[in-house]
Amino acid sequence: MKFNATELNREFYLNRAENEASEIYSKDSTRRNRTFQNILETTLYGHAAEAYLIQECGYSDDDRKYKDLIDIKGRSVEIKVTEGEYYVPYVLKRAEKAKLQTWRGYPDILYVFIGNRKTADYELNGVYKWNNERFVLQSNEISV
């Protein structure tokens, strides 16, 4: 799965990212000395994959706090975007650490996208599923 962020419904994409960035910025614990602009840029980068899945694949927002999306089968999925293949193991380790903190209610399904900040090109790296120890690659495609 490949897409370019310019294909997204701009109004939906920007409003969604601005809402989350505002929420992050509103608390010292999540703001962490970052400017609103910095938080917005980071949020836009990550939200492109989420907006695409909503717009093109029929996914919906998971309205619970700090959760990403609900897939077409009604399952909660976590969406992560990173800059290159070299960074995927680190993304998986962070997700595994979060999953082991059971109070978080971290989803069993994780999608990792590679996003190019300069070109706005995104590509699915993989769909990973929790096996009670770690996230394991299930597929390089999303079935819709």
Regions found by a protein language model. Name each.
Residues 1-75, 80-144:
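Nucleic-acid endonuclease domains
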